[in-house]
Amino acid sequence: MSEALEIPTDIKSRVSEEEWKTREDLAAAYRLVAHYGWDDMVFTHLSARVPGPDEHFLLNPFGVLFEEVTASSLVKIDLDGAVVLDNGYQVNAAGFTIHSAIHGAREDAQAVMHLHTDAGVAVSLSLIHI
């Protein structure tokens, strides 16, 4: 018999007000990306630097659709990929690779977006010559 995965939902009480606001903003950005059709299931991702002195950032959990992302489901990780605040979700490995490199190199980057828009895909496939 399999056991249900227990996902903590009380993340708000475990983070600062600044981090919670960042979580809300990033979750809203995920929802907007889904609304405009700029997502392609789990292979695009957004991240946001967590306010404060530590080099932590928030990333979508692996396997969660963009329209399902919430402030509590975002995974908080460091630049080495270690989960800083366990919320029961797994790290998006592809997202970590891209976002950790950018956040590590650019302290001024507060948010990073990696998207596959239809227009961008068409250009990358050379279907549209520019």
Role assignments for model-derived ranges:
Residues 1-111, 122:
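Long, non-catalytic terminal segments
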Residues 111-117:
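Ordered, amphipathic secondary-structure segments that act as subunit-interaction surfaces
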Residues 120-126:
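Short active-site loop/helix that positions an aromatic residue
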Residues 128-130:
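Conserved small/polar residues in nucleotide/adenosyl-binding loops
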